[in-house]
């Protein structure tokens, strides 16, 4: 069934005008952006298939090639989907600009959407000023965290250049289990020793998962 064959009261655009965006399903909202379907498949059905296959959460980080595996999604529609989720990420980033960090949860919320590939471990350094506001976010390494591979010089080089008052280490666990490994503890100890020498405070090391985080400082390990 084509969108034009829907009861006028049930068409996504008309319902949005009448009842607001909150009254629409994710598939209907996406359908308004993509506008047209194919000869045999209306755009609402296409969007329902997209969300059923990948989930709304995964759509935010999916590639153009993966999107085009769904019937009815070509280059133009795939680019529209990528663009709308990228705008949402940038809105989130702009709201967190110069965010003041008061607890590990602040870091967890700040990092939402910033890990480019959650199937791999990423180590970030957050640079803070004297008010504990983030002045820079730096990706230091990608891959399994290992004290033998992480050199303090690489971590603190940018902190010195930025005149950072303090730093916070952040890395993700692809498994979702945020409990620290022995390697995580070794890296933390190594960089804590270096921070004492360089006199740039290591405020915390935070491990993030999909739904929560682990703070070395709040757990008494730093």
Curated annotation (Swiss-Prot):
<dbReference type="GO" id="GO:0046872">
    <property type="term" value="F:metal ion binding"/>
</dbReference>
<feature type="binding site">
    <location>
        <position position="173"/>
    </location>
    <ligand>
        <name>Zn(2+)</name>
    </ligand>
</feature>
<dbReference type="GO" id="GO:0008237">
    <property type="term" value="F:metallopeptidase activity"/>
</dbReference>
<dbReference type="InterPro" id="IPR046778">
    <property type="entry name" value="UPF0758_N"/>
</dbReference>
<feature type="domain" description="MPN">
    <location>
        <begin position="100"/>
        <end position="222"/>
    </location>
</feature>
<feature type="binding site">
    <location>
        <position position="171"/>
    </location>
    <ligand>
        <name>Zn(2+)</name>
    </ligand>
</feature>
<keyword id="KW-0482">Metalloprotease</keyword>
<dbReference type="InterPro" id="IPR025657">
    <property type="entry name" value="RadC_JAB"/>
</dbReference>
<dbReference type="Pfam" id="PF20582">
    <property type="entry name" value="UPF0758_N"/>
</dbReference>
<dbReference type="InterPro" id="IPR037518">
    <property type="entry name" value="MPN"/>
</dbReference>
<dbReference type="InterPro" id="IPR010994">
    <property type="entry name" value="RuvA_2-like"/>
</dbReference>
<dbReference type="InterPro" id="IPR020891">
    <property type="entry name" value="UPF0758_CS"/>
</dbReference>
<keyword id="KW-0479">Metal-binding</keyword>
<feature type="binding site">
    <location>
        <position position="184"/>
    </location>
    <ligand>
        <name>Zn(2+)</name>
    </ligand>
</feature>
<dbReference type="InterPro" id="IPR001405">
    <property type="entry name" value="UPF0758"/>
</dbReference>
<keyword id="KW-0862">Zinc</keyword>
<keyword id="KW-0378">Hydrolase</keyword>
<dbReference type="GO" id="GO:0006508">
    <property type="term" value="P:proteolysis"/>
</dbReference>
<comment type="similarity">
    <text>Belongs to the UPF0758 family.</text>
</comment>
<keyword id="KW-0645">Protease</keyword>
<dbReference type="Pfam" id="PF04002">
    <property type="entry name" value="RadC"/>
</dbReference>
<protein>
    <recommendedName>
        <fullName>UPF0758 protein Ppha_0935</fullName>
    </recommendedName>
</protein>
<feature type="short sequence motif" description="JAMM motif">
    <location>
        <begin position="171"/>
        <end position="184"/>
    </location>
</feature>
